[in-house]
Amino acid sequence: MKKLLSAAVVAAMALCGSAHAAEITMAANSTGKNLDFLRKLFVEFEKQTGHKVTLATMPPSSTEQFAQYRLWLAAGNSDIDVYQTDVIWAPQLADQFVDLKEAASDVVDQFFPSIIASQTVDGRLVAMPMFTDAPALYYRKDLLEKYGKAVPKTWQELAATAKEIQDKEREASQKDIWGFVFQANAYEGLTCNALEWIKSSGGGQIVEPDGTISVNNEKAAAALEQAKSWIGTISPPGVLSYQEEEARGVWQTGNAVFMRNWPYAYSLGNGADSAVKGKFDVAPLPVAAAGDKPSSTLGGWNLAVSRYSDEQEAAIALVKFLTSAEVQKGRAIENSNLPTLQALYDDPDIAAAQPFMPNWKPIFQDAVPRPSAVTKVKYNEVSSRFWSAVHNTLSGSGTAAENLELLEVELTELMGSSW
């Protein structure tokens, strides 16, 4: 692999024409094994280029990350050269990042066009896709087999199966087990979860592609009320403060029958220290009724170069290295992160290491985007208003119908004459 990585770096350096050893800093989140994987790659990159890469560790919460990024970029901070960015941030931060279109012209056709499009703003490629994301339903196949249950296809089936297995396992001395864990803290992750409940129930996607505010409807309200009914019955009350890692912690210790989470949790769940190693599988998220289409929120992480960086050439070389086929292959095998390069879904090594991954391709290809493209720079506010309304509902502060009605008023005011 070292030879392949070296080739990727050499190609990137040739394109950028960097002639001196640079010191660059990359901001990246601490979810799962991301930081450990990056540190290994930095060693190889430094060896091949002579550059020095420092890691600026960010919290796993994308909401906290975005807030810090905005502060740095608004101040014209040159300390951070490369930013790991969420798929939804491109429209909001585009003006702060370098256009990578020319630098990536030799490889851009290898990526999924829809993912490249998500990072293109006004014709400028503001970030290179590092890995894509779409959540799925993790389930304990051993427990479903034990009780003769099928993988649930609807949310109602999920609740019933989760409750039955949870209760029977508790009777059999598994006192700490819960039926279903997910992410219900008041942050961007709750927007993702709630969008899935609503969209899969025919309730729209908060703000439609044409800019119409659609969230205040009966199907959306019913979806939220259904989720509210899980709290304290099949989901622990503490789920209201769970983000991805808290949900994974409960799941990986063997204390949940089902979990909604992103692909990164797959390899960790099969780690040597996992209580559920070899005992689980994944399936598409449930729907409201048979015949409805599963709705996984489109996620993914990208790499952007700051326009305030004093080492843009070296920063671009690092971005091309970290998004290369060889690195994405390693990330898929080691971290179970979904590649953004089309050809890797036919790679036999990836299929052998992560048998689920080829089957995940249609999940993310049909994934539902959050309304960041249509709401543009106002998306962060749209999302925070939405997740607040959802969290209030789940917490018992007002009904879903009441909270969505108030949300519609707030979003209409926020939109003004246009998004």
What spans do the regions from the language model cover?
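Long, aromatic- and glycine/proline-rich binding clefts that accommodate carbohydrate-like moieties
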Residues: 114, 118-119, 283-285, 333-385, ...
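Short, polar/charged alpha-helical segment
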Residues: 32-53, 386, 404
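Short, well-ordered beta-strand elements
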Residues: 22-32, 51-57, 81-82, 126, ...
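Glycine-centered hinge/linker elements that transmit conformational signals in sensory
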Residues: 162, 209-240, 285
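Extracytoplasmic "Venus flytrap"/periplasmic binding protein-like
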Residues: 25, 44-114, 118-120, 142-153, ...
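Extracytoplasmic/periplasmic solute-binding protein
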Residues: 126-130, 135, 159-212, 256
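Hinge/lid segment of periplasmic solute-binding proteins
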Residues: 86-135, 175-176, 190-193, 200, ...
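Short, solvent-exposed loop/beta-turn-alpha elements that line the ligand-binding surface or hinge
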Residues: 101-113, 179-188, 201-222, 271-275, ...
